[in-house]
Amino acid sequence: MPRHLLLLFALILAFSSSAQTFSGAVTDDAGGGLPGAFITAKNPAGDVLGDVSLPDGTYTLDLRAWAGQRVTLSCSYIGMETLEREIAQLVAGKSYALDWSLSSTAEALDLVVVSAGRFEQSAAEVTVSVDVLPPRIVETRGTTTLETALEMNPGVTFVNGEPQIRSGSGFSYGAGSRVMILIDDLPVLSGDAGRPTWGFLPLENLEQIEIIKGASSVLYGSAALSGVINVRTRFPDARPLTRITRQVGFYSDPRTEQAKTWNVRPQQSNLRFLHSQQLGKWDIVIGGNILRDDGFLAPEEDAQFNVRDYHFSPSLIGVDLLDRTVDRYGAEHRTRINTNLRKRDTKVEGLVYGLNANWQLGESLNTLIWQVAPDSIYGAFGGAATRTNQLIGTVDPYVQYLTPGGTRHSFRNRWQYLNNDNDNEQSNGSHVIYSEYQVHTTGEQWGIEGLNLTTGLVNMVALSRAELYSGGSSDGINSASNRAAYIQVDQSLGERVKLAGGARYEHFSVNGKGAGKPVFRLGANYQVAEATFIRSSFGQGFRFPTIAERYIRTGLGALQIYPNEELRPEFSWSAEVAVKQGFAFKNTRIGNIVGFFDLALFRQDYEDFIEFTFGQWGPDEGEVPSLDNAYGLGFMSANTGGSRVTGVETSITGRLTTPTFQADFITGYTYTNPISTTPDYNYNPDPDGTPTTYLSTSYNSEGMLLKYRSPHVFRFDVQVSGQKFFGGLSARYQTALKNFDAAFIEFEEDSNLSGINWGVRGWLEENPELPWIFDARIGREWTNGHKLSLVISNLTNAEYSIRPLSMEAPRLTSLMYTYQID
C-alpha cells in the first residue's frame, strides 16, 4: 500500500510540474535553431514572464500561476520579425507545445524611434532623416566614449571632440554646440559652454542611439540647430541581466620615430558593469565605468626620467579607484556610476515615477596645440595644456501618468552639476535646472484616426561661475534662462500617408539680455509601395549664444580668446527630400539578404552664422599691444553673415543570413558643399580695427568653403557572427580640411611673434590628404555567458591630423572579456 501511495504522489508531482507549461523551439528561415531568442508571456494585469532559448533553440515557459487567465505570448529575435500568439484562457493541467519560425525581412530590420516626434514611430515612416546605431556598434568595437561610436555614422564627424552633422558646424574651442545631445530626451550640454562631456554618457546601458539630421529646434530647442543625438537607455524586462566587461590595451609607437620621446608604451584599462532587474513593481538598473587611459601623446617629463621597458602594469588587472593622477598629455582617468529606478504604482493605474542619476569623477590633461612638427607633434605647446579635475553629475526625478483614455502626462526634471577645476586659472562650474511638462494624446478620444498630438512646456535655468567668463562680470558669475512652449501634430491619412507639423516659441536670456523667436517644421512621408517610402521635410532652427561664447576671456600661450557681449542669435532653416527602399533577396547562392537603402538630398541656410574666428579683437581696454598679448590678435565668436550647406547622403543597412553565419552591415557616404554666402562681410566694424572677413581669415577660400569641414565622408562596418566565433571590420574616411583659420600659418610666419614655430605649413605639404582608417575585431563566445575578443583600432597605425596642430590616435590593440548572465 505505501508503494502505491508513493507512485500516486509521484504521478501527481509530475502532472502538476507540467501544468500550464509552454515548450518548443525557435527556428530561422533555414530551420536552424535560434539561440538567445526572447519568449515572453503577458497577462491582463500587465505581469510579464519570459525565457531565453537555449543554444539549440528550445525553450520552456512555466505559467502555472496564471491558470484560467488570458495570456499573450510573443517571440522576438534581433533583426527578425516578432510573432505573437494569444491563448484566451489557460487550461489547468494542460501542457502546450508551441514552436516559432522567425523570418528575416526588411521590415524586421526597421527600428522604432522616439526622437523624431517624441513618440514611438517606425524609422521608415518618419518625415526626417533618423539614423539608429545599435548597441553592438559600442559593445563589439571596444568603445570607451560615445564619440568613437558616432564616428561610424555617415554624416557625423568630429573636430577635437566637437560634433558636426552634415557640415553644420566647425571648430569653436568647445563652446556652442549646434548638435543637441540628449540622454533619454533630456539635454546634457553644459550650462555655460553648451558642450558635451563624451565620457560621461552611459555606454554600459544602451537601448540604441538615435541621430536626427537637420534643424530640430521645434522639438528640442536652441542647440538642435543642425541635429540631435539621443542616447536611449534600457530598462529591465522579465529577465534579469548582469554584464561585466574588462578591457586592456596599449597604443602602438608613432610612425614618426623622432616624435617619440618616451620609452614606455601608453596603456588603456577599462571596466564596465551593468545589472538590471525587475523586483515586483520596481525596475532597477545599476551601472558604471572605470577608465584609466594614458592617452597617446607625450608625457609631461622627458623620456630619461622613465626608462622602463614596456610591460603590462598591475593596474591593468586591478583598477585603483582612488588613483586618478595623469602624467601624459591626452590622458584621462575617470570613474562613473549610474542608476535608473522606476516604480509602476499599483494603487493608481497608469502612474509611473522614478529617479535616474549619473555621476562621474575624473582627471585629464589636454592640449589643443602640438609643440612642433615633425619632431614633437605629440608634445604640447607652452601654455596650451590644461589639467582638469572634473566632477559632473545629473539627478533626474520624473513622473508619468497614462489616463484610461490613453493620454500620457509626463513631468521630467534634471539637475546637472559640473565643476572643472583647472590648473591654469581657467576653472569653471555650473548648475543647470531643467524641467519639461509634456502631454501626448491620440485622436481616438475625438474620433480622429491616426492622430498623434504632442505639446509641452520647458523651463531651464543655468548658473555659472568661472575665471574664464570674466568678460560678463568681474567676479565671473553669469546666469542664463530659457522658456519655451511647443506643439507637434502627426497625422496618418490612410495606411500610406504620414504628415507632421510643429511649432515652438523660445525665449532666452543671458545676464538680462534676451531674445525670443518662433520656429516651425513641416514634413510628409508617403509609402509608394510595400517597402518604398518617400519623405520630405522643412524645419527652422534658432540658437542663442552660450555664456562662454559671449563672456570668455582667456589665453592659450600666445593664442588669446576674447569675449563678445554683442553676439547675436543665429537662425537657420533646413529642407530635404529623400527615399527609403527596403529590399529582400531570398534563397540566393550566398543566403538571404535583407535591408534598407536610403538616399537624401538636403540644404541648410544660416543667418548671423556664429563662427569662432581669428582677428584683431584686442588688446583689452587699458592694455598696450605687445608680444605678451599677441598685439591684440586672437580668436572670438562672431556673427559672420550668411552660409549654406547643400549635399547628398546615402546609406545601406542590411543583413545576410546563411545556415552557418549571419552578417550585419552598415555603410554610408555623405557629400556636403558648405559655403559662405557673404565672404566680404566685415564682422569687425571697429573703424580703428583691421577689417575681418571670411576672405581675410581663411587659409584657402577656393569655392568659398567654410572652415573645418570635410566635404566627403564615408563609413562602413560589418559584423559576422557564427555559432561560436565572430568578427568585424570597420572603415572610415573623410577628406582633409581644405580651409581653416589662416592664423595658424600666419602666427609662425609673423616676425613680430617670435618663439612660435609649429611647423604647420611643412606638415600640410607632406600630408595633404587624410588616410583611410580601418578597425578590426575577432572573438569567441561561449554558451555559458563568456566572450573574449581582440579589438584593433587604426589597424594600419596611420599617422594623421584632422585639425592642424592636433594629432589623432595611433593603433590601439585591446583584449576584451565580457561575462553576461541573463
What are these regions (language model features)?
Residues E147-L186, S190:
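Extracytoplasmic beta-strand/coil segments of soluble accessory domains associated
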Residues S95-W100, L146-A149, Q164-R166, V179-L182, ...:
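N-terminal periplasmic accessory domains that precede
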Residues S410-N413, Y417-N420, V461, Q527, ...:
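Membrane-embedded beta-barrel scaffold of Gram-negative outer-membrane proteins
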Residues T245, L493, K498, F602-D605, ...:
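Gram-negative outer-membrane beta-barrel transporters
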Residues L186-G214, F273:
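Short acidic/polar hinge/loop motifs at secondary-structure boundaries
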Residues T27-D29, A37-P44, S74-E81, V91-E139:
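Short, acidic, small-residue-rich periplasmic hinge/interaction motif at the N-terminus
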